[in-house]
UniProtKB/Swiss-Prot annotation:
InterPro entries: HD, Homeobox_CS, Homeodomain-like_sf, Iroquois_homeo, KN_HD
Primary location: nucleus
Its biological purpose: Transcription factor. Required for D-type inhibitory GABAergic motor neuron synaptic remodeling, acting via degenerin unc-8-dependent and -independent mechanisms. Regulates expression of genes involved in synaptic remodeling, including negative modulation of immunoglobulin domain-containing protein oig-1 and positive modulation of unc-8.
Protein name as it appears in the record: Putative iroquois-class homeodomain protein irx-1
Record's subcellular location: Nucleus
Any Pfam family: Homeobox_KN
Residue stretches of biased makeup (Acidic residues): 191-201
Positions of region (Disordered): 1-27, 176-292, 340-377
Organism, scientific name: Caenorhabditis elegans
Gene Ontology cellular-component annotations: nucleus
Keyword line: DNA-binding, Homeobox, Nucleus
Disruption phenotype: RNAi-mediated knockdown delays the first appearance of synaptobrevin snb-1 at puncta, probably corresponding to neuromuscular junctions, in dorsal D (DD) motor neurons in L1 stage larvae by about 4 hours. Causes ectopic expression of immunoglobulin domain-containing protein oig-1 in late larval and adult DD motor neurons. Causes a significant increase in expression of snb-1 at puncta in the ventral nerve cord on an unc-55 mutant background. Ectopically expressed in ventral D (VD) motor neurons on an unc-55 mutant background. Restores normal backward locomotion on an unc-55 mutant background.
């Protein structure tokens, strides 16, 4: 007989077994058997070794950033290895030194304009406010500093660009003979630079090409010299061309030639003193005048020092520099030597007085002879 327990087990329905599907393989895993394992010339890390290296890199970056805390422009390093950056994809197979970048914006400047700041030329729309200002100030086209700042803000240009634009405009008007202002009618606030720019352009020497072009123009448009027959009646058929001889002009200017005088600038010490210097250069002082002025100056200084010494001798000794005493002693010795070497000449007034005294006073030889005669009489 079959036991009851076995019968019950046989009667129980069997449940169907469900199998779980395998996870889909990723692309690198799928290509692992096809591609070589060391494709980029790197070596593989064990997962545990990769984690240790990542922890070391993160700790080193944190320690370096902590030591540089408080300094401007602290370099920022990436903390560890990102999750999507596999260790085998790193250069050399490990984390290694990562490239650093700075947090300051001014350190991203590049001289070739890679930082987004590009130099651009001024357009007609940008210079329209400048033209309007120049049209409304024809009698005085010299903007002040406040006007330049206002125009620079309105046009998006710099102060240098605004000043250069106005200087070029004034030069262009001068060349076209459309100058409607007087050079003296200028504003005193920041207009000296503009006037200097104008003067530099006008006083700038012309280039060699322009001189050659002018000479060519003179030769082209000049009066042609016709051929004239020779006065001697030799051969009538042969005529010679007479060319006028040009006077050679020396490139070195003469002293008598009048050089164009430059307009003196306001508040210019050099221009104010230039006239005095030129007059002094015409008549150089002689050596006698120099000696006279030097002696007068020394005498005045000595008198002043004597007065100071009389007022307070102790203060004078303490405040006087020792080298000054030495200098005064040397000057006194030099004065004595000059006095001994100088020829002793009597002035004309003293000479005349001496001659008169000699004529008026009788000679000692004549006095004894005259006295006995008077007694005899």
């Amino acid at each position: 007989m079959i036991p009851i327990a076995n019968q019950v087990k046989m009667e129980e329905p069997t449940t169907p077994q469900t199998t779980t599907p395998a996870p889909p393989t990723s692309a690198p895993d799928a290509l692992r058997g096809i591609l070589p394992p060391n494709l980029l010339g790197q070596f593989h890390f064990h997962p545990a070794m990769a984690q240790v290296l990542a922890a070391q890199a993160q700790a080193a970056a944190a320690a370096q950033q902590a030591t540089l805390a408080g300094f401007p422009g602290v370099p920022m390093f990436p903390h560890g290895i990102p999750a999507d950056l596999k260790p085998e994809m790193l250069l050399g197979g490990g984390p290694g030194p990562m490239p650093m970048f700075f947090s300051d914006a001014h350190r991203l400047y590049h001289p070739y304009g890679l930082d987004g700041i590009k130099k651009r030329n001024a357009t007609r729309e940008a210079t329209a406010p400048l033209k309007d200002w120049l049209h409304s100030h024809r009698k005085n086209p010299y903007p002040s500093k406040a006007d330049k700042v206002m125009l620079a803000v309105g046009t998006g240009m710099t102060l240098t660009q605004v000043s250069t634009w106005f200087a070029n405009a004034r030069r262009r008007l001068k060349k076209e003979n459309k100058m409607t202002w007087s050079p003296q009618n200028r504003r005193g606030d920041g207009c000296d630079d503009d006037e200097d720019d104008d003067d530099d352009d006008m006083n700038r020497p012309s280039s060699s090409t322009s001189i050659n072009s002018e000479r060519k123009g003179e030769s082209l448009f000049g009066k042609p010299h016709l051929a004239s027959p020779t006065p001697s009646g030799g051969s009538g058929g042969s005529d010679e061309l007479t060319t006028p001889k040009k006077e050679l002009v020396s490139p070195i200017p003469n002293d008598d030639s009048e050089s164009p005088k430059r307009k003196p600038k306001m508040w210019s010490i050099a221009d104010v003193t230039s006239d005095d210097d030129s007059s002094k250069k015409d008549s150089p002082p002689s050596s006698d005048e120099n000696l006279l002025t030097g002696s007068l100056f020394q005498n005045a200084m000595k008198k002043q020092m004597e007065v100071m010494a009389r007022l307070d001798p102790t203060l004078f000794r303490h405040t006087m520099h020792p080298f000054m005493f030495q200098l005064l002693a040397q000057q006194a010795a030099q004065g004595q030597q000059l006095a001994l070497l100088a020829p002793q000449t009597t002035p004309p007034n003293e000479a005349g007085l001496n001659s008169q005294a000699e004529t008026s006073t009788p000679s000692p030889a004549s006095s004894p002879t005259s006295s006995p005669r008077s007694h005899q009489e």
